[in-house]
Structures are given as structure tokens and as C-alpha cells.
Swiss-Prot record:
It is found in: Secreted; Host cell membrane. A motif (RxLR-dEER) lies at residues 43-57. A motif (Calmodulin-binding motif) lies at residues 78-82. Interacts with the host papain-like cysteine protease C14. Interacts with the host calmodulin. This is RxLR effector protein Avrblb2. The Avrblb2 protein of Phytophthora infestans is a polymorphic member of the RXLR class of secreted effectors. Especially, the polymorphic amino acid at position 69 is critical for activation of Rpi-blb2 hypersensitivity. The Avrblb2 homologs that are recognized by Rpi-blb2 have 'Val-69', 'Ala-69', or 'Ile-69', whereas the those that are not recognized have 'Phe-69'. One of its GO terms (cellular component) is membrane. Keywords: Host cell membrane, Host membrane, Membrane, Secreted, Signal, Virulence. Belongs to the RxLR effector family.
Length: 100
């Protein structure tokens, strides 16, 4: 039983030392996975409300993207609302409600 314990202990020490030798510095492997924004290739991922429109048969083109829904990224001009006028109108309406 004691020899089995020594064998397991030796295996654990060897496994740990080989794992440590594989990555001696924990942050050493990270620079390979990190990329700067200027080197990242632009990605063309399909987003919601897009579909592939097939081109003619046998012409060698696989298709192109068509935007099915209208874009929601448009800037919408908000109406100019005078808060003071709204408060005055609310006070007048409240006064009418209390009189009747």
C-alpha cells in the first residue's frame, strides 16, 4: 500500500513539473492570442434580417447579401418639446377636473 502511495506521489510530481515546463511563464502564451485592432481582419458576419440572394445558375457567383429589414441604426430627430407648456396645460387640466 505504501509503494502505491509513493507511485501516485511520484506521478503527481512528474505531471506537475512537465505541465510547468510546458508553460514556464503564465502570460507567455497570451500575446499570441491577443491581436491589436489594426491587424484584425474585417469580418462579414450575417446579422439579423439579412438573407443570401442567389444569382443566376452556373455563372460562378454564390450570391450576395440583401438587407431584408430596414436599418435601425438611423438617427431620428426628436421633436422639440417645450416642457413649460406641457406643465401649464397639465395644471389647467387639473384645475378643470377639480372644479367639476
Amino acid at each position: 500500500m505504501r509503494s502505491f502511495l509513493y507511485g501516485v506521489l511520484a506521478f503527481a510530481v512528474l505531471a506537475r513539473s512537465s505541465a510547468v515546463a510546458a508553460f514556464p511563464i503564465p502570460d507567455e502564451s497570451r500575446p499570441l492570442s491577443k491581436t491589436s485592432p489594426d491587424t484584425v481582419a474585417p469580418r462579414s458576419l450575417r446579422i439579423e434580417a439579412q438573407e443570401v440572394i442567389q444569382s443566376g445558375r452556373g455563372d460562378g457567383y454564390g450570391g450576395f447579401w440583401k438587407n431584408v429589414a430596414q436599418s435601425t441604426n438611423k438617427i431620428v430627430k426628436r421633436p422639440d418639446i417645450k416642457i413649460g407648456k406641457l406643465i401649464e396645460a397639465a395644471k389647467k387640466a387639473k384645475a378643470k377636473m377639480t372644479k367639476s
